[in-house]
Amino acid sequence: MKKYNKIVLTGASGRLGSYLREPLSKISKKLVSTDKIKIGKTLNNEVFKKLKLENFKDVNKILKKTDILVHFGAYSNEGPFQEILESNILGAYNIWKCAEKNKIKRVIFASSIHSVGMYKVNQTIDHKVMQKPDTFYGLSKSFGENIAQMYWDKCGIECLCIRILSCAKVTSKRSLSTWLSYDDLIRIVIQSIKMKKLGFEIIYGVSKNKRSTI
């Protein structure tokens, strides 16, 4: 199995990031996990770096000599615009600008269904529909997709944008329509890293089931 010299994971203390740490550590010689909040015990080949995404200098320092960047760090809900602006919008700019400076060739980005959240609930949509964000949070994820597209077109930085629906335990039949299992999330991320060619792609993060409108 090929092992990458260095993978950087942002948002490592979050619910989704915490599930990705161990799988990412298995395909890397060194996993650098970052977040504002410290993680628990680190894995054998993992180091933790405290990081605020809005701090360009710190982002640039951490991304030096990085092979793959898995960007799951964000203000993860709707909230005050200033907080979303700093973590999600300025943070996304810092991520891609520093990826360019450090010659990182591939980014895996946690986008959200909220980037297209204004479509009707029963309307079937695909990855080609126009963005219709429903919140400032969704707007920030739309920005992340757009800056990823720009850096692919201008600089050749590959990116998979995963529009995650809901990656949590199933609590009802209705919740199956948006459910992404943790195992499927891990498979998406790992396979997108291993792909020989990726380019720029947007996919929906949802597990296969009959109730989904995606």
PLM regions and their residue ranges:
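Conserved glycine-rich Rossmann-like NAD(P)H-binding loop of the short-chain dehydrogenase/reductase
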Residues: 28-40
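Glycine-rich NAD(P)-binding loop of the Rossmann-fold in SDR/ketoreductase-type enzymes
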Residues: 54, 83-94, 131, 139-142, ...
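Conserved Rossmann-fold NAD(P)-dependent oxidoreductase catalytic core, especially the SDR/UDP-sugar
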Residues: 94-132
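Catalytic helix-loop patch of NAD(P)-dependent Rossmann-fold dehydrogenases
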Residues: 86, 120-159
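Flexible, glycine-rich beta-alpha linker
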Residues: 136, 157-177
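N-terminal Rossmann NAD(P)H-binding glycine-rich loop of SDR-like oxidoreductase domains
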Residues: 5-27
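Alpha-helical substrate-binding/gating segment
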Residues: 164-169, 179-201, 208
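NAD(P)H-binding glycine-rich loop region in Rossmannoid oxidoreductase-like domains
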Residues: 40, 51-87
